[in-house]
Regions:
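Acidic, glycine-enriched catalytic cores built around paired aspartates
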Residues: 291-292
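Short acidic/histidine-rich active-site segments
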Residues: 254-259
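A SIS-like phosphosugar-recognition module
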Residues: 192, 260-261
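Extracellular/luminal recognition modules and glycoprotein regions
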Residues: 298-307
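Polybasic, proline/glycine-rich intrinsically disordered low-complexity segments
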Residues: 276-287
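Alpha/beta enzyme core
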Residues: 1-253, 267, 271, 307-337
């Protein structure tokens, strides 16, 4: 029903993810909990049917997996036979082998290959995956999603690293050769630090002298114009191109960049405006003059608020008696350059 409402409102693409809905976290935070594949695939099918019922045969479904950083599941998957999808999901659980005599009241037990296994269950009643299984789970998530109606996949990673992304996409494309990846160039990453560390580690492996750099302090402004800093910036500037060329990224997106631009510009304006050195010049030089030079329409903020449209309405209904805002005394005329 929600998907249909979104489509009716104009959505041509819908992204869904494999986290539980009631305890969902940001994809770059800890404490993520995933659902078994049967639950996730049911959602994909529901979205596809919503598109089809509304007469849209080419609606886009993006299936996102948060499994790389998710160490928990809310439930054990239903499995009917060894090797089925539920059994594969459960195979990643952190279990201990026990005997029938070791069973305790309320224990949840899995039988696999003739063994009794007790999954590690937390006080929250969530079950824990084995450490180091994130990439394997991501690959399985993506393959099954594409096989069951998704058009594109989205893997949420903990760092922007072309090699890591490529390794997973290559495995997916072994099964789905035309798999297309959506990637989030997220502000949640510290891009400067990540790429400086990548350069530092690469140079170390190559035997290059890195004694001039402190790996634990690579965010220092002292390195902004250094050879390492410049090399990291080159890698950042080519990340999208490299990701598409080598890691199968079909669509690059960036989440909430305007949140950060608004915060930074407001902070800078406040500091300058209330300083003795700049005062009003902070706004004029840093904002208004640049709006004029770059032809930003918002410099005429009255127009952007609809004053010209209001004048049209006034003139239509009142004719010559209309009191229009766009007369010669309107200061907005100062921007008609």
């Amino acid at each position: 029903l929600l998907a249909k409402k979104m489509i009716e409102a104009g959505a041509c693409a819908i992204q869904i993810e494999n986290q539980v809905s009631d305890e969902k976290q940001c994809g770059h935070q800890d404490g993520k909990v995933t659902v078994p594949h049967s639950d996730f695939l049911a959602k994909i099918n529901a979205v596809r049917y919503a598109f089809l019922e509304l007469g849209i045969p080419n609606g886009i479904i993006v299936a996102r997996t948060d499994s790389l950083g998710a160490g928990l599941t809310k439930q054990i998957a239903v499995t009917n036979e060894p090797g089925d999808l539920g059994d594969q999901y459960n195979s990643y659980l952190d279990c201990e082998e026990i005997s029938a005599e070791e069973l305790k009241n309320g224990d949840v037990i899995i039988k696999r290959e003739g063994k009794l296994l007790r999954p590690k269950r937390l006080a929250s009643n969530l079950f824990q995956f084995r450490a180091g299984t994130g990439e394997d789970r991501c690959v399985l998530d993506c393959i099954t999603s594409l096989q069951n109606g998704a058009d594109m996949i989205w893997i949420e990673t903990e760092k922007p690293h072309v090699g890591q992304i490529k390794a997973m996409v290559d495995r997916i494309r072994d099964v789905i050769p035309n798999a297309k990846l959506v990637y989030n160039n997220s502000p949640s990453f510290n891009w400067t630090l990540n790429f400086r560390q990548q350069v530092f580690d690469k140079w170390t492996e190559e035997g290059k002298d890195t004694s001039a750099y402190d790996r634990d302090n690579l965010m220092s402004a002292d390195y902004d114009d250094s050879e390492l800093g410049n090399e990291a910036d080159k890698m950042i500037s080519s990340f999208q191109k490299d990701g598409s060329a080598h890691a199968g990224i079909f669509h690059h997106l960036i989440t909430l960049p305007t949140y950060h631009t608004a915060a930074l510009s407001t902070d800078n304006l406040a500091k300058g405006y209330f300083s003795r050195e700049e005062s009003m010049l902070a706004y004029v030089k840093g904002i208004q003059r640049e709006e004029i030079r770059q032809g930003i329409a918002c410099v005429k903020h009255q127009n952007m608020a609809g004053s010209d449209i209001g004048d049209n309405h006034k003139e239509y209904f009142a004719g010559d008696a209309a009191l229009k805002a766009s007369g010669e005394d309107n200061t907005m005329n100062q921007f008609n350059l």
